[in-house]
C-alpha cells in the first residue's frame, strides 16, 4: 500500500525545520519533498508536527522468554513504539539465554510472533551468562545476533573476555559490556557517596565500574575488537573511554536518560523505584556525562529499559531487583530538561536516539532518506502532560519519574510504513 505522510516538519542537516511530504511503499521511503504527491496513496495527515526517524535503542530488556510476569515481547515492543522507538536490541538475560542456535531460534520465533517493531536479539558472550564457558560467535551471528553481551553482570575473568573479543573480532561483531567488578560491589544497592550514608544503605563505589572499563579497553586493543560500554555512569569511566578513543581503540559508549537527569541526592527515600545498576551517581559524575555526550566521548543514549513487577519494587532497596523502565518517558524527559532549556539542540537529541545509536552496530536505521526503511515518528513538542506510571503500556511501573511534567511527546509511530502507535484522540 502506498502512503504519504503529509505536511510535516523535518530537520535538515543544519538543524533547520522544513515542511515536507514523505511517500512510502513496500516498507521503504520512496520520496521526500515539498511537492511529493502519489496517486492512489493513503494520506496520513501530519498537521505540521515534527517528523523524526524512528528511535533506535541498543540496550533493552524484554524479559521473554522466562520472565513474562515482568514484560513480554508484545508489551515491551508496544511500549517502545509508544515512546517512538522502531528498532530495539534485546539483552540476553532471559530463560533460556540465547547462548545456542536452538535458543536463538526460539527467541527469533517469539519476536516474529509478537513484536510490533524491529527487535534485534543479542547473543550472550558466555553460556547461561555465567562468565565461564564461551559461546560460539560464528553460529549465533548466523542466526541473527546483533551483538554479544552478558549484560546484567560483568565478565570477571580477563581471559574469558579477551578470548571472546578475539573471536568477535574475527567475525566483525561488537562486544557489549556491563562493566562491574564483583569484588567491589560490597552488596551495595546505591552509589557509595553522601546519600547512601544518610539512608544507611550499602553503597557501590564508582571504581566498581571504571576499573573494568579500563581493563576491557586494553583487552579490546590487544584483540583488535570493537567494544561498546553499557550505561556509563562515572567521571572515571568517562576518562577511561575518552583516553581509549584518543589512543585509537575501537570503543563506543552509551548513557542512560536517568544518569543524565538524576543524581544520588535526588533519591528521596529508601525506595526501590530509584534502584538501578549502575546507580545514580554524584553531581560531578552527572556533569561529566553531559560533557562526554557533547564532545563525542559518549556516542548515544540508550534506555536500559528494565521492567519489574510492583511486588518486587514495592519495598526498600535491599532485596529488590535493579532496574527502571524507560521507553515511554525517555524522549519527553530529555526534550524538556535539555532542549527546552537550550542546553542541546533538537537535532542533537534526535541523532543521539536514532542514527548515532544505529551506527554502533552498523544498522541501516535511524535515518529519513529515500530508500531507507519507512520508520518514523511524529512528535508534538507543544504537548505537555504529567507522567503517570499507571498508564504505561509496559507491564513495568518502576520509574522514579512518576508525577514529573514533560513536554515533547511522540504521538504517532510508523514502522516499515505501517502505523504501530497512534495517540488516542
From Swiss-Prot:
<keyword id="KW-0665">Pyrimidine biosynthesis</keyword>
<keyword id="KW-0479">Metal-binding</keyword>
<feature type="binding site">
    <location>
        <position position="277"/>
    </location>
    <ligand>
        <name>substrate</name>
    </ligand>
</feature>
<feature type="binding site">
    <location>
        <position position="151"/>
    </location>
    <ligand>
        <name>Zn(2+) 2</name>
    </ligand>
</feature>
<feature type="binding site">
    <location>
        <position position="178"/>
    </location>
    <ligand>
        <name>Zn(2+) 2</name>
    </ligand>
</feature>
<dbReference type="GO" id="GO:0006145">
    <property type="term" value="P:purine nucleobase catabolic process"/>
</dbReference>
<protein>
    <recommendedName>
        <fullName>Dihydroorotase</fullName>
        <ecNumber>3.5.2.3</ecNumber>
    </recommendedName>
</protein>
<dbReference type="InterPro" id="IPR011059">
    <property type="entry name" value="Metal-dep_hydrolase_composite"/>
</dbReference>
<dbReference type="GO" id="GO:0008270">
    <property type="term" value="F:zinc ion binding"/>
</dbReference>
<feature type="binding site">
    <location>
        <begin position="61"/>
        <end position="63"/>
    </location>
    <ligand>
        <name>substrate</name>
    </ligand>
</feature>
<dbReference type="InterPro" id="IPR006680">
    <property type="entry name" value="Amidohydro-rel"/>
</dbReference>
<feature type="binding site">
    <location>
        <position position="61"/>
    </location>
    <ligand>
        <name>Zn(2+) 1</name>
    </ligand>
</feature>
<feature type="binding site">
    <location>
        <position position="231"/>
    </location>
    <ligand>
        <name>Zn(2+) 2</name>
    </ligand>
</feature>
<dbReference type="InterPro" id="IPR032466">
    <property type="entry name" value="Metal_Hydrolase"/>
</dbReference>
<feature type="binding site">
    <location>
        <position position="304"/>
    </location>
    <ligand>
        <name>Zn(2+) 1</name>
    </ligand>
</feature>
<keyword id="KW-0862">Zinc</keyword>
<feature type="binding site">
    <location>
        <begin position="322"/>
        <end position="323"/>
    </location>
    <ligand>
        <name>substrate</name>
    </ligand>
</feature>
<keyword id="KW-0378">Hydrolase</keyword>
<dbReference type="GO" id="GO:0005737">
    <property type="term" value="C:cytoplasm"/>
</dbReference>
<feature type="active site">
    <location>
        <position position="304"/>
    </location>
</feature>
<comment type="pathway">
    <text>Pyrimidine metabolism; UMP biosynthesis via de novo pathway; (S)-dihydroorotate from bicarbonate: step 3/3.</text>
</comment>
<dbReference type="GO" id="GO:0004038">
    <property type="term" value="F:allantoinase activity"/>
</dbReference>
<feature type="binding site">
    <location>
        <position position="59"/>
    </location>
    <ligand>
        <name>Zn(2+) 1</name>
    </ligand>
</feature>
<feature type="binding site">
    <location>
        <position position="93"/>
    </location>
    <ligand>
        <name>substrate</name>
    </ligand>
</feature>
<comment type="function">
    <text>Catalyzes the reversible cyclization of carbamoyl aspartate to dihydroorotate.</text>
</comment>
<dbReference type="InterPro" id="IPR002195">
    <property type="entry name" value="Dihydroorotase_CS"/>
</dbReference>
<dbReference type="GO" id="GO:0004151">
    <property type="term" value="F:dihydroorotase activity"/>
</dbReference>
<feature type="binding site">
    <location>
        <position position="308"/>
    </location>
    <ligand>
        <name>substrate</name>
    </ligand>
</feature>
<comment type="similarity">
    <text>Belongs to the metallo-dependent hydrolases superfamily. DHOase family. Class I DHOase subfamily.</text>
</comment>
<dbReference type="InterPro" id="IPR004722">
    <property type="entry name" value="DHOase"/>
</dbReference>
<dbReference type="InterPro" id="IPR050138">
    <property type="entry name" value="DHOase/Allantoinase_Hydrolase"/>
</dbReference>
<feature type="binding site">
    <location>
        <position position="151"/>
    </location>
    <ligand>
        <name>Zn(2+) 1</name>
    </ligand>
</feature>
<dbReference type="GO" id="GO:0044205">
    <property type="term" value="P:'de novo' UMP biosynthetic process"/>
</dbReference>
<dbReference type="Pfam" id="PF01979">
    <property type="entry name" value="Amidohydro_1"/>
</dbReference>
